[in-house]
Amino acid sequence: MRVPVFENYVKIVQHPSAKMEFGSGAVMICSYGDYTDVLLFRELKLQEKISIDTAGRMTDNAGKYQGLKVNEAREKIIQDLQEMNLVERVENIKHRTPCCERSKNPVEIIPMEEYYVKQIEHKNELLDIARSLKFHPEEHRRRLIDWIEAISIDWPISRRRYNATEVPVWYCKSCNEANLPEPGKYVRPWKEKPPFDSCKKCGEKDFVGDERTFDTWMDSSISPLFITKYNRDQEFFEKTYPTSLRPQSKDIIRTWLHYTVLRCNQLTKKPPFTHAWIMGYGVDERGEKMSKSKGNAIDPIPILEKNGADMFRLWAASEVNLGSDFRVSEVKITGVGKFLSKLWNTARFVSNFPVVEEEPLETDKWILDELSKVIKESLEGYQDYNFFIPANRVREFIWNIFAPHYIELVKQRAYGIEFDEKSTRAAWSTLHICMKNLLLLLAPITPFITDKIWRELYSQESIHKQIFPEVKDDYQLSTITANIIEFNSLVWNKKKEQGLSLKNGISIEIPKNLELFESDLRAMHKLQR
């Protein structure tokens, strides 16, 4: 078949990628129109024609269109076809086109010689590692496996950019042999003389340095090797490699995570780490991913200066479950400050009483049961690197149970009002047990306020030198929590309905299932017999 304008003859061949039910049933391909064209050209072993140069202009293969920009050439070709009466109609259609992230211009494919790292032949090894890593959360394992399974080319690692790690190669001007320096020293071949005198192949002495740079992931992909002193301190490396954890965002699973696994496995024959901790995106109020190019990113520095790191950290930990996108809102970040104020005021109340040891009463056993549940669930969250669980579990416990119910229940007893010394000491002991454990659970998330309270109440040694609490004995009383909350709410509402202050007495019968807590309930609510 003869192609108009250029008058070239092209073969028509059968291929399964052409769909008879779609359009004319024929598919036109060119050397480098898109990725599908490239694959078909390689498969069919066709002779390429390079029509666009590195400046984005048409080459001599474009005939009379040589020198025009790509869009200019397209417009001129349409015009010429119309003049030849070969155009049936012109219409605008929408289709998927890869565009540059920064300039938003369509991407044109140009063949160039580059360096590659082999990855196709390593796919089975990479899949084995992807299946063996412990993902947090598990759902993101699929992203890595899907990416590895979809790999169809090796990894191009050289780039024609200015700011990146230089490719450390000098080429012999005589035979074009690539000559490398000894490892260990950073070199800039495009501006420095080679650290050798002659070509290793032909012995000539004239060289030209490579002007290209590496893909940024070439550096990042060996970060586990750098921190474990690979090839610099063998004893240290053997003790620390593989590392424990790779924390990162989900959008760079196919780059940073994949290339790290690829290169570290190639160099060491081992996975680079045991755990992959994958977080979501920070998104704006409309749910769009934050980025500099979109102009919707929020500078965290003013927020940190205004609210402090603890508030920011607690918001980040408690906003969404691990792996999910999180909506960035200064209102929500500031709102976390209410809880930190609650924590501070609770600690201030507890600080009124000495640290003692005493056997707990029933009310104390109940809150210690609830505390044990918080400790257990929080430690499970930490074990899974999911800070959302301890952040919210501790927050809910202090806000909804410990402060409004337990502290109010034992306040009279803690002050020694109409209670014996042993009962009062039991309240003191339990208050401090709860406070200590809650501070320890929160310390990794809010390191500053917890350390401040800890040093004020318990020890001049930092809280960050302590160990996590252990789950205590189960008194089998946490099942009564809903009943306590329900009864307290009932009394508060009754007083409100009757126009009474919370300090006023009221006559309400205590349910049988709460009789174990009668003394504290009567003291709390001023219940009349």
Report residues per predicted region.
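Active-site cores of enzymes that catalyze phosphoryl transfer or operate on phosphate-rich substrates
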Residues: 1, 101-105, 221
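Active-site-adjacent "gating/activation" loops or surface patches in catalytic cores
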Residues: 5-13, 211-241, 400, 404-407
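Residue patterns forming the tRNA-binding/recognition surfaces of aminoacyl-tRNA synthetases
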Residues: 8, 17, 22-175, 204, ...
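Short active-site loop/helix that positions an aromatic residue
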Residues: 37-46, 225, 229-230, 261
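Feature 926 captures the class I aminoacyl-tRNA synthetase adenylation module centered on the KMSKS loop
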Residues: 143, 150-218, 222, 266-309, ...
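Short Ser/Thr-interspersed hydrophobic loop/turn segments at strand-loop and sheet-helix junctions
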Residues: 258-266
